[in-house]
Regions:
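Short, charge-rich amphipathic segments
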Residues: 1-11, 42, 65-68, 143
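Non-transmembrane, amphipathic alpha-helical segments
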Residues: 8-12, 35, 100
């Protein structure tokens, strides 16, 4: 349903990532409290997979979705999960080219590691900060790609 109401153009990419930052930060804050050990182990396995897929952007994007999905589920709020999925899906249209670049994938992996570490420490504030920083990095790399004429 969100896709029906939002049509993304360059001028509102910043609004999308502002919304994602708010949602992902709160989701991470809640997940730091609510995630169980199985979900944390799942995240750790996903990160291992991401290290192995850095040279395959399509595979990395799949594992990126699984990483975020596990955190959305771990937040314990099904509505936040659905909102996170919708905002993530909207961003993919603009993210595809940026996420082909090795330096972008490496930065995402570093961001994911920092977020995982905060979640593992059960530190809601650090988890929220890590999620928000990740969204800032995603936004920056997306806009860098846009300024190079490459949003697809």
């Amino acid at each position: 349903p969100i896709r029906f109401f939002l049509s993304l153009e360059k001028m509102n990419i910043s609004e999308l990532y502002d919304a994602r930052s708010l949602i992902e930060g709160d989701v991470a804050r809640r997940a730091a409290i609510n995630m169980d050990e199985i979900q944390l182990a799942t995240l750790d396995n996903i990160l291992t997979n991401q290290e192995e897929t850095l040279k395959d952007a399509d595979e990395f994007r799949l594992s990126d979705f699984k990483f975020h999905e596990t955190i959305w589920i771990g937040s314990g709020n099904s509505f936040l999960k659905r909102i996170g999925e919708s905002l993530n899906s909207l961003g993919l249209e603009f993210r595809r080219r940026a996420s082909e670049r090795p330096e972008v994938l490496n930065q995402s992996l570093r961001d994911h590691r920092a977020l995982f570490d905060a979640l593992s420490m059960r530190d809601p504030s650090a988890a929220a900060q890590a999620a928000e920083k990740h969204m800032q990095n995603v936004y920056r790399s997306t806009m860098d790609q846009s300024s190079e004429g490459g949003i697809s």
